Amino acid sequence: MDVSRVCIYLGNTHLYSPTCVLYNLFFNSNQMDTLQPISPSELIINPDGSIFHLHVKPGQLADKVILVGDPGRVPMVAAHFDTCECDVSSREFRTMTGTFRGKRISVVSTGIGCDNIDIVLNELDALANIDFATRTLRPELRRLEIVRLGTCGGLQPFTPVGTFVASEVSIGFDGLLNFYADRNRVAELPFEQAFRAHMNWHGEQCIAYPYVVHADKELLDRIAADDMVRGITVACGGFYGPQGRRLRLPLADPEANRKLEAFTYGGLHVTNFEMESSAVAGLSLMLGHKAMTCCMVIANRVAGKADAEYKNSIDKLIRLVLERI
């Protein structure tokens, strides 16, 4: 075992990595002294004691968290709650915490993209694991269960509009994890090498260095039953060019979607496009939380079909996640 990281075996076997979870919340030699207060410029706390962007206070966060992109989807999820204890909004971030069949759950909107996931995941972890009074890490670290519930574009004939897809593996085109020291500790490096070779990108073409991360196996198995298709999800840094859509601007790699459709690794196909799963899985793994993403296909790029009236049918996916989280 690599002794430079603290690794606790939690029974979570990765498909492409060592049979342990990196539960290395700030225990890495590159990371901060756990007794050293975090400065106000690094951890910004609002005057009411809430975290900077989310405006949520530590006591308002449940251990089970559902992430949605659209703030309007938060009350759609919370409508199924038996009780609701808080409803907090700030910018595109809305949080409602309540109970569903005895389970305390927070549903949080993230907005669109991995840049927003960087804000949300770091602030959720701060709420869970930093003492706001002393600005130091709590002695007992808290592990969250995080499920992103969203929409996506299908990339295979077997993922038509309406399919529920679970991201067993996510490929990040956004570059976010490349800014963190633990990037190579959580990434699936042989998978990355095989993917880069397959895409055959050179020079400045699609230059963000793709990273590959795996969902938490136990949480994936619990959420993704036989009613979901498992596969590889590509998390893009945009909706148009990065996902191969051309309106007026030409694409750097017009063949990218065809190459993605043909790529396989470890028996898995690239099933779908979205814009957040890689950051959710990667940051959660770095921070010691359990995370996975499941989405409903609302556009199939192979068939050229889309459903803009998907909001009624996504309620089935909401109920499934609430029952299984």
Q: What feature does the model see in each segment?
A:
Residues 300-325:
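His/Asp/Glu-rich mid-to-C-terminal helical/loop segments that flank catalytic regions of hydrolases
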